[in-house]
Amino acid sequence: AVYTLPELPYDYSALEPYISGEIMELHHDKHHKAYVDGANTALDKLAEARDKADFGAINKLEKDLAFNLAGHVNHSVFWKNMAPKGSAPERPTDELGAAIDEFFGSFDNMKAQFTAAATGIQGSGWASLVWDPLGKRINTLQFYDHQNNLPAGSIPLLQLDMWEHAFYLQYKNVKGDYVKSWWNVVNWDDVALRFSEARVA
């Protein structure tokens, strides 16, 4: 298999009480695994199509690959973007903190904009803080499903899963409470590392 399911960098219950261990186990072991399997299956079927010179299903196969691979990428970032409360800084500092101040005016402004983007998603999607290498700036984005609405080249720094499977067992349909709780477990060390790497990519 080309793609494999990464291990979580902490125990299922490590993010409690903000995100329950039950959610984390289902989310990682079932949902994320399904995207990994789906991406590998799409690659296999594309290889079969090449061997047979039969591309009648190319549109479906390309969509399947994009959807599942994006789901795998997003979740792989999402897990590392979080850490048990108290194990990482509560807000960004140094170069990332300065960049957020530059592009949003303040950390609180960025947090408010990101929260609005997350809670405003209609249906399933992601809120993301990204580095735009063309504009040399940080933006907030809403992804629909896993890949739609994403400008090519944007590099995710901070990802928040707004699919119902990420919160419904604990927060029901109250997205705002989920997002408010999630801020407590953001791993700003990981976000800062992604920012440093993205700027020189």
Curated annotation (Swiss-Prot):
This is Superoxide dismutase [Mn/Fe]. Destroys superoxide anion radicals which are normally produced within the cells and which are toxic to biological systems. Catalyzes the dismutation of superoxide anion radicals into O2 and H2O2 by successive reduction and oxidation of the transition metal ion at the active site. GO terms for molecular function: metal ion binding; superoxide dismutase activity. PROSITE patterns: SOD_MN. Belongs to the iron/manganese superoxide dismutase family. It catalyses: 2 superoxide + 2 H(+) = H2O2 + O2. It comes from the Bacteria. Shows decreasing activity with increasing pH. Slightly inhibited by azide and fluoride at pH 7-8; the inhibition is drastically increased towards lower pH. The gene is sodA. Binds 1 Mn(2+) or Fe(3+) ion per subunit. It holds the Pfam family Sod_Fe_C. Its EC number is 1.15.1.1.
